[in-house]
Amino acid sequence: EKELTEQKYPFKHVYTGISKTVKRALPLKAIKRIKELDLTLKPHLDYARDVFLFSFYTRGMSFIDMAYLKKSDLKNGVIIYRRKKTGQQLTIKWEKCMEDIIAKYNGCSTTQYLLPIITNPCADERMQYRNAISRINVALKEVARLAGLNMPLTMHCARHCWASIA
C-alpha cells in the first residue's frame, strides 16, 4: 500500500488575494465643513479648496481634465470635454457653484483655459500641471487639518467623494 504524504502548504502565510483599499471618500458633512472654512487670509489654501470643490461639483472631474478644460468647452449651460485618460466625451450641466468659482478667478488667466492652472503660455504646460497638483495637494492637507478632518485631503479624494455620494 502506498504511503500518503502530509500536505505542507508552504504558502499558507503568504497573502495572495486583493487587499482592501483605503477609503478616500469623505461624507457630505465634511465637504460642507471644507466649503464653509474662512480662508480669506490664506489665498493659496482658498484656491486649493476651490479647485477641490470644482472637481467635486463637476462629478469628480480629474485634475488633468480640469487643467486642460478650455473656455470654449463651456457652451449653452453645459461643459463638454474629452477625458485625457480615456478619450471619452463627457457632458456636465453648468451650475451656479461652478460659475462662482470660475468668476472668482476670472482675471487670473489670459490663456484659453477655464481655470488658472496652466497660466503661462510660454512655459511647458505639463510642468505647470505637475507643479500645480503638487502645490494644491500640499495645501489641501492643511485645509483638511483646519476643517478638523482626520484624513489627508488630495485632489483624488474629490473624485472619490463625488462617486460615493452620487
Where on the chain are the PLM-derived regions?
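Active-site lining segments that contact anionic ligands and/or coordinate catalytic metals
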Residues: 29-31, 48-53, 76, 87-89, ...
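Basic, Lys/Arg- and aromatic-enriched nucleic-acid-binding interface segment
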Residues: 4-63
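Active-site/catalytic core of tyrosine-dependent DNA strand-transfer enzymes
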Residues: 30-31, 95-150
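Short, contiguous acidic/charged loop-to-helix segments that flank catalytic cores in large enzymes
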Residues: 21, 39-43, 80-93, 123-132, ...
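Short alpha-helical segment immediately N-terminal to, or the first helix within
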Residues: 54-55, 69, 165-166
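Generic recognition of stable, solvent-exposed alpha-helical segments in well-folded globular domains
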Residues: 26-29, 46-49, 61, 93-100, ...
